[in-house]
């Protein structure tokens, strides 16, 4: 059971890092193209990406903490 939770926390952390990298790549693309940056869709996507990274990082950290208990 503890091993399963540890595995899940590792996966959550990995997904968090992956989402962060995707966010950085997408963010740099949006910054490079001013037309997309000016559009509301581009801004909304950046906010969504940040929220996704935030949630996945917290979930990974929480699962990691849970595995130690």
Curated annotation (Swiss-Prot):
It comes from the Archaea. It is found in: Cell membrane. The keyword Transmembrane applies. It is a multi-pass membrane protein. The chain crosses the membrane at residues 7-29, 44-66. This is Uncharacterized protein AF_0842. GO terms for cellular component: plasma membrane. Keywords: Cell membrane, Membrane, Transmembrane, Transmembrane helix.
């Amino acid at each position: 059971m503890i091993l399963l939770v540890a595995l899940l926390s590792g996966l959550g952390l990995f997904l968090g890092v992956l989402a962060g990298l995707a966010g950085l790549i997408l963010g740099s693309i949006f910054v490079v193209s001013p037309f997309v940056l000016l559009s509301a869709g581009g801004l909304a996507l950046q906010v969504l990406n940040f929220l996704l990274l935030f949630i996945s990082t917290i979930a990974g950290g929480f699962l990691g903490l849970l595995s130690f208990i």
